[in-house]
């Protein structure tokens, strides 16, 4: 009987398990959360989430919801918390996926979401203020393109534990409201454009364990209230903009294990009191103006792994207690005023110690040695007993006198243009002797280094090179030497005279594609002969792109045989893109050439036989005859005939596009057959052509009478060749032969937006509302790229409907960069030559030549209103009645009837909310005061519905802003005194790449001071 009971019990137990299993497996994700995930996917442009399966089913290995076998750094996971009947999404982690959307605005549909990690993607836009109403515990947006300010609403996230916003494009001040986060532990804000002082409310952040604010533009001093952060474990303040001294209150933070403060300006100060920091592992106080002796107590810290006190003014001997640091991984005392003997324990330590540029007495090392303590330039000149200030080189013997220096940094020996470049392949920091009259010293180790390939102090990568100039030897740029702190090359045996130092650079660690790996920013300083020649040098900016070569030249005089070149990292730039450990100086090659004719080396004279005079005379005569003969032949063939200035200018430029011959273009266009003419642009005629491979092209030809000249032509080539974006017209190449100046573009089937909207009836394209919305957003995205996202900061200057082209899918592409203006160094410019199209130009630009990207924003606003209305900003109903769209829109707003602007051809088939938003955005963009106009990234966010900015409120403020009224009146007087021919006006045609908007309008019409009913009623 007992056996039967036991069997019965077992049976019920198994059945219960089965029923329970079925019960648990029936747990589902609420529809509201599924819908919210779909919204998140749409915003992020996350396309591989499979909504046909359960996102919370952890047994699924496919479907895009999780990828347990992903490579290091890549994460793709949605995590749920499931009870017996229901599941809730708690974590969304999407790392290193190059997502190219924007941040999801509304997270209210995911009420249980605790973590949102979008590290290392290509997301743009701003941080939605709506996130402040969520229950998030951790937010990470590290390594994206997020711009705008940090919303104060995040201060409402009382549950927030981690906020990681490093390596973005955030600007403005830190909102004081963040000081109200009672549970905040990690706050990472490094490598943005944040400004202002650290908010005093941060004194309340007593739960902080990790704070990083490096590479920003903060002002003020490091606050004393840091003593309140009693649980702080990591503090990183490198090149933050804050000034010293380091407050003594920092000594109260006994839990610190990682302290990195570098590049502080301000007065000299003594070493901060750190005696109580017995748990310290990483102590970096570089370039902080510290004075006095090294504190002896540091030698008693047995947990220390990295000690960097470089570039200060510390003096005195190295304390005897520092012998206890023999197990420390790295010690850097570079560039101080330390003196006395170099301790024997340091000599025996090897290349993990760097004491270069100090005042030590001569040490036990008679000669410099690789893989030994780096004593390069570590002895006072008074002790070295020679003219050198390099102690371990005091016995260096020059093999001969050199009249040049050529180094293939990080690479093998090569011969380029008959010049031998020495190898530079050593892979460990420290000292290196080439045995060819030059040495080098590399200081620093890359902290938090995640690199897994190549060497730690050199890099090889030819896949990213974009060198098309045949005069540049690409082999010099396929590798590079790296340094974490400071890299020095020193020639020791140069002959006396004047030289030109050529430093060769190419950024080969970033990626040019629209991926997070191209978001890195590298900055370092360049010193020649001890003088800082360049501060905050950025290879990508100088070379106009990734993988492109640039050479910096510096004249020097050598008097004692020695030439020193030093590259130094000053704490700026990103440190974790594409991975952690990518920062600091990078150089491809060094070439130093004499500005004089060097003397011949011994043994190069003549031997017996003919006299020197006879030999020289024969050689000269033969050479002259040969030159004349060859020259005559080449002249007869036309090879030596003078080239046009344009050809000469073009030959000296390195554009990343193809070069077409005039013969190819003539074949493609049937010798510019008038039947193939499709328009008349600002440059001249535009012809359709078909290449031999079947590619359809549009050829823009610069006409002799064009108002746009050589400068604009070369400018357009330079701009477009460096830019790639879905909403910019693609430039295939160009042709420069004699006076023939041609641009070869992709052919866009649907011509211009102006032709589609308000061209001749037979050319118009019926554009429904979704098409118009798509076109408007596309234009905004293209401009946002030009202004904020491209390596170059570009102001187009001539945005209008005829400069927006439409492909076969009606995707908009911005064209005609002939008027584009680089904006590299300053945020504003006073243009000496106003160029644009009347009716689209912003008032401040039309009147004063005051050019910023806000001029493009104004022009975009006009185009946006034209898209809604379907008519040009200025069009005539009759000879006596000229219609001005901007005037009418403002009057309709005053009458609260803005939707009357909508194109009657749409009828009622349009989204009223979207239309109203587009009209308001257009009005906001055309605000008279530039400061009232939004950035284009903000415009994109508003158009896509990702921003909660109250457009109506902003518009109200801008309309009531009278600060620019006098300037507008002045502008009207200005236009009253000049002829209409002085404004850039060209006729409208039906071809692409055209300019338009010829108008008889005057300044009073286009830029009225008060846009209200009274003005409208008094117009004539």
UniProtKB/Swiss-Prot annotation:
InterPro entries to which the protein is assigned, alphabetical: Kinase-like_dom_sf (IPR011009), Leu-rich_rpt (IPR001611), LRR_dom_sf (IPR032675), LRR_Rcpt-Like_S/T_Kinase (IPR051824), Malectin_dom (IPR021720), Prot_kinase_dom (IPR000719), Ser-Thr/Tyr_kinase_cat_dom (IPR001245), Ser/Thr_kinase_AS (IPR008271)
Enzyme Commission number, as recorded: 2.7.11.1
Location (main, coarse): membrane
Pfam families, per database record: LRR_1, Malectin, PK_Tyr_Ser-Thr
Extracellular side: 27-614
PROSITE patterns listed in its UniProt record: PROTEIN_KINASE_DOM, PROTEIN_KINASE_ST
Residue list for modification Phosphothreonine: 832, 837
Any one cellular-component term (Gene Ontology): cytosol
Catalysis performed (reactions): L-seryl-[protein] + ATP = O-phospho-L-seryl-[protein] + ADP + H(+); L-threonyl-[protein] + ATP = O-phospho-L-threonyl-[protein] + ADP + H(+)
Transmembrane portions of the chain: 615-635
Keywords (A to Z) from UniProt: ATP-binding, Cell membrane, Glycoprotein, Kinase, Leucine-rich repeat, Membrane, Nucleotide-binding, Phosphoprotein, Receptor, Repeat, Serine/threonine-protein kinase, Signal, Transferase, Transmembrane, Transmembrane helix
Residues annotated for ATP binding in this entry: 678-686, 700
GO biological process, one term: jasmonic acid and ethylene-dependent systemic resistance
Active site: 798
Gene3D superfamilies in the record: Galactose-binding lectin (2.60.120.430), Phosphorylase Kinase, domain 1 (3.30.200.20), Ribonuclease Inhibitor (3.80.10.10), Transferase(Phosphotransferase) domain 1 (1.10.510.10)
Modified positions (Phosphotyrosine) in chain numbering: 745, 845
Topology in membrane: Single-pass type I membrane protein
UniProt-annotated glycosylation sites, renumbered to this chain: 50, 81, 124, 138, 156, 193, 276, 289, 359, 386, 389, 417, 461, 469, 498
Protein name per its UniProtKB record: Probable leucine-rich repeat receptor-like serine/threonine-protein kinase At3g14840
Organism whose genome encodes this protein: Arabidopsis thaliana (Mouse-ear cress)
């Amino acid at each position: 009987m007992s056996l039967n009971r036991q069997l019965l019990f077992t049976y019920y137990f198994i059945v219960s398990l089965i029923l329970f299993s079925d019960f648990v497996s029936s747990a589902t994700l609420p529809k509201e959360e599924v819908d919210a995930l779909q919204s998140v996917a749409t915003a992020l442009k996350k396309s591989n989430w499979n909504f046909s399966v359960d996102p919370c089913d952890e047994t699924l290995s496919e479907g895009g919801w999780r990828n347990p076998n992903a490579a290091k750094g890549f994460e793709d996971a949605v995590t749920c918390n499931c009870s017996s009947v229901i599941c809730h999404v708690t974590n969304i982690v999407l790392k290193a996926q190059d997502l190219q959307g924007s941040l999801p605005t509304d997270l209210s549909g995911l009420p249980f979401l605790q973590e949102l990690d979008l590290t290392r993607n290509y997301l743009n836009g701003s941080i939605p203020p709506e996130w402040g109403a969520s229950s998030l515990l951790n937010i990470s947006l590290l390594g994206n393109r997020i711009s705008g300010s940090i919303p104060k609403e995040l201060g409402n996230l009382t549950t927030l534990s981690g906020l990681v916003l490093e390596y973005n494009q955030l600007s403005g001040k830190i909102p004081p409201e963040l000081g109200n986060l009672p549970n905040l532990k990690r706050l990472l804000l490094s490598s943005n454009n944040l400004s202002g002082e650290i908010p005093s409310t941060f004194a309340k952040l007593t739960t902080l364990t990790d704070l990083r604010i490096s590479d920003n533009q903060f002002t003020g001093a490091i606050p004393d209230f840091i003593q309140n952060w009693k649980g702080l474990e990591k503090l990183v303040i490198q090149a933050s903009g804050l000034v010293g001294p380091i407050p003594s209150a920092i000594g109260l933070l006994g839990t610190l294990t990682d302290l990195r403060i570098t590049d502080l300006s301000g007065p000299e100060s003594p070493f901060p009191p750190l005696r109580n920091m017995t748990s310290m592992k990483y102590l970096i106080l570089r370039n902080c103006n510290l004075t006095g002796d090294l504190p002896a107590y540091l030698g008693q810290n047995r947990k220390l792994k990295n000690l960097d006190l470089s570039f200060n003014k510390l003096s005195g001997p190295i304390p005897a207690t520092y012998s206890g640091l023999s197990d420390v991984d790295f010690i850097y005392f570079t560039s101080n005023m330390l003196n006395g003997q170099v301790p024997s324990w340091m000599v025996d330590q090897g290349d993990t110690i760097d004491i270069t540029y100090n005042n030590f007495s001569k040490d036990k090392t008679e000669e410099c040695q690789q893989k030994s303590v780096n004593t390069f330039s570590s002895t006072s000149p008074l002790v070295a007993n020679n003219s050198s200030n390099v102690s371990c080189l005091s016995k260096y013997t020059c093999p001969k006198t050199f009249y040049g220096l050529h180094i293939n940094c990080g690479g093998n020996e090569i011969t380029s243009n008959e010049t031998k470049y020495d190898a530079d392949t050593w892979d460990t920091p420290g000292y290196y002797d080439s045995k060819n009259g030059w040495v080098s010293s590399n200081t620093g180790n890359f902290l938090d280094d995640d690199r897994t390939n190549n060497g730690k102090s050199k890099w090889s990568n030819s896949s990213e090179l974009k060198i098309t100039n045949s005069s540049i030897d690409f082999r010099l740029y396929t590798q590079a030497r790296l340094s974490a702190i400071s890299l020095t090359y020193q020639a020791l045996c140069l002959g006396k005279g004047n030289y030109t130092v050529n430093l060769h650079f190419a950024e080969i660690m970033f990626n040019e594609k629209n991926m997070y790996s191209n978001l890195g920013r590298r900055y370092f300083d360049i010193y020649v002969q001890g003088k800082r020649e360049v501060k905050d040098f950025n290879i990508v900016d100088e070379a106009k792109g990734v993988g492109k070569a640039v050479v910096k030249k510096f004249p020097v005089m050598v008097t004692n045989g020695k030439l020193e070149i030093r590259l130094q990292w000053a704490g700026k730039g990103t440190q974790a893109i594409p991975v952690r450990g990518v920062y600091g100086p990078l150089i491809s090659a060094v070439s130093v050439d004499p500005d004089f004719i060097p003397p011949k080396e011994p043994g190069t004279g003549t031997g017996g036989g003919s006299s020197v005079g006879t030999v020289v005379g024969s050689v000269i005569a033969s050479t002259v005859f040969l030159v004349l003969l060859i020259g005559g032949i080449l002249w007869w063939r036309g090879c030596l005939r003078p080239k046009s200035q344009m050809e000469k200018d073009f030959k000296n430029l390195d554009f990343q596009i193809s070069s077409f011959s005039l013969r190819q273009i003539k074949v493609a266009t049937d010798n510019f057959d008038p039947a193939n003419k499709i328009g008349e642009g600002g440059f001249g005629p535009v012809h359709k052509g078909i290449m031999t491979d079947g590619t359809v092209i549009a050829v823009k030809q610069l006409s002799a009478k064009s108002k746009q000249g050589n400068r604009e032509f070369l400018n357009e080539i330079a701009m477009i060749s460096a830019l790639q974006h879905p909403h910019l017209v693609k430039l295939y190449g160009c042709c420069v032969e004699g006076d023939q100046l041609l641009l070869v573009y992709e052919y866009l089937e649907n011509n211009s937006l102006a032709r589609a909207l308000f061209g001749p009836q037979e050319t118009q394209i019926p554009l429904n509302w979704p098409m118009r919305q798509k076109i408007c957003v596309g234009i905004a995205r293209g401009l946002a790229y030009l202004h904020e996202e491209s390596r170059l900061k570009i102001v187009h200057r001539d945005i209008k409907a005829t400069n927006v082209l439409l492909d076969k899918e009606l995707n908009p592409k911005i064209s005609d960069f002939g008027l584009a203006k680089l904006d590299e160094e300053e945020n504003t410019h006073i243009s000496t030559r106003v160029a644009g199209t009347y009716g689209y130009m912003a008032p401040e630009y039309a009147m004063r030549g005051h050019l910023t990207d806000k001029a493009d924003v104004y022009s975009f606003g006009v185009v946006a209103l034209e898209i809604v209305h379907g008519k040009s900003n200025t069009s005539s109903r009759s000879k006596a009645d000229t219609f001005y769209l901007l005037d009418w829109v403002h009057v309709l707003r005053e009458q609260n009837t803005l939707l009357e602007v909508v194109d009657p051809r749409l009828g009622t088939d349009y989204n009223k909310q979207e239309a109203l938003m587009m009209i308001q955005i257009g009005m906001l963009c055309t605000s008279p005061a530039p400061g009232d106009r939004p950035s284009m990234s903000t415009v994109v966010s508003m158009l896509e519905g990702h921003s909660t900015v109250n457009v109506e409120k902003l518009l109200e403020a801008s309309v009531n802003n009278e600060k620019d009224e006098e300037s507008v009146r002045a502008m009207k007087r200005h236009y009253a005194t000049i002829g209409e021919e002085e404004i850039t006006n060209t006729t409208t045609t039906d071809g692409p790449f055209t300019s338009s908007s010829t108008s008889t309008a005057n300044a009073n019409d286009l830029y009225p001071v008060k846009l209200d009913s009274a003005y409208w009623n008094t117009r004539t």
